[in-house]
Amino acid sequence: WPTPVGRAATRPCRHVRVSIDLADLGKGFDNELGVTYVELGPDGGTARLTIDDRLLQPWGIVHGGVYCSIIESLASVSAQLWLAENGGGNVVGVNNNTDFLRAISSGTVTAVSSPIHRGRRQQLWQITITDERDRVVARGQVRLQNLPAE
């Protein structure tokens, strides 16, 4: 470390202390959205996303699926990092409940994850997404199942 993670990372990703292939973060769907992981660790993390026209629904505001996706991704990465330090294995999402609280159409949003429950079989994480003025635009909870290592 420090290792930049995600597409167009401008700051190094800090606090990653477990054996995870950082090159895999920010690939796939995260890359399509433009998610950048800023800080990650077993107790939570931060990701950012700059809103552009691709992420808007027909009425000019951010599509709710964008928020659901950031929430799912950050919760999954956070849960995986915790599990890697606490016995190993893999996590899979089993429920994503996202509330859309404020409509925006531009700017950069920041998502922050924090654990609610981390147990032997399941984890529950809360993610809050704020805009550049620190207003909450969405929040969500993701329940994840801990699976044994194969």
Q: What is each stretch, according to the model?
A:
Residues R11-E150:
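Terminal targeting signals and extreme-terminal segments of soluble enzymes
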